[in-house]
Amino acid sequence: VEYLVLRDNVEYSRLTAFKGGGAAVSVTADAAVKWALSGKFAQNSGVNYLTDVIQPVLTIDGVRRPLGKYIPTDAYTEHDGMRPVMSLTAYDLTYLAMSSKIETRLHLAKGTLYTAAIQALLVESGITDFFVEANTATLQADREDWEPGTDRLTIINALAAEINYNSIWMDGGGTVHCSAFRMPSADAISVTYRDGEYSIQYLSLIHISE
């Protein structure tokens, strides 16, 4: 696995995972922010952990497969024996919406498309790469439900639930999605999962030794 450091969405540098450092990408489907990256890495003085984005990329059979984009939330230096290491925790791009809070009571006008309101909140959160599935549902009354200080992720997911959409989630390429809930059925199968080392479950628990 390669750990790219993105600056302005362009590869700027790379992080090197330490052997035995527990570098891992995990997915928790029912969490508000679903993807997480954690582990210990070699120090890299060129990385700005306040603004840069981390993108793990897994190569299988010569095909590069990105595993999302991550916002560092906790980065500090510790010592592993005689060597200094960077201990890092980061979360997927929906974390931007969780950390973005409204400063005044949010007003949503009657007749506003739910999807338009969700798109506006995503942009206000700093999320620019997103896909919101089209829907003609509109607000049936003026809304001022959310107090100042409410995070935008809470509002987005509440609006999504009202039109039977899933909570927002990030795909492997780093695009944030808001899409309609669909009941599982054989007709709806679009992805086939395998067991073994290439399974999604394996990837969600992968530990890297470099």
Set out the residue ranges of the language-model regions.
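A structural signal for short, hydrophobic beta-strand segments that form beta-sheets
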Residues: 15-22, 71-73, 195-199
